Amino acid sequence: MPEGDTVWNTARVLERALVGSRLTGSDFRVPSLATTDLTGWTVSGSASRGKHLLLRLDAPAGTGESRWTLHSHLRMDGTWRAYAPGERWTARPAHLIRVVLRAPAATAVGYHLHDVALVPTAEEERLIGQLGPDLLGVDWDPAEAVRRLAAHPDTPVGVALLDQRNLAGVGAP
C-alpha cells in the first residue's frame, strides 16, 4: 500500500518528467474524463497531500480556461510511472492504465488510479480540505497535528495516527 512518502516521491518523479512541459497528448480511461483532451496544456506543478497526488495544469491561452488540477488517489494499488519517449510501458498490465499524459520528453502513465478528477485549482480544497497536516508538506505544522490528536483523547493512539483528518500521509486512506 502506498504511504505518504511513496506519494511524495511519485510527485517528485512526475515533477521531473512533466513540469514545464506542454502536453502533446492525453488519454483518460475513466468514464468521467473519457472525452477530456489536455493537448496543449502546460504542467505547472506536481504535489502530494497525504495520499492524494495533484498535477497542476495551465490551459492554453485563449481557451477561456485557467488553472486546473488533475487529482488522483493511489489507495492500495495505484501507481504513476514516467517513461522516456518510445520506452515500453512495463509497470503493470495495460488494462489497469487509467491516465496517460504525453509530453515531449516523457510520458506519464497512471495505473489503477482511484478518484481521478479534473477540477479548477481554486476548488481542489473540496477534495483534500478534510486532511490534517502533511508530514512531508511544505506547510507541515506539528502544533496543529498535536492539537488535532489531542482533541479526541479517548481514541487509541494507533487509530488516531491513521486518521487522515489528524495527520495526512500515515496509514490508511
Predicted regions located by residue number:
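Structured catalytic/nucleic-acid-binding cores of DNA maintenance enzymes
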Residues: 1-173
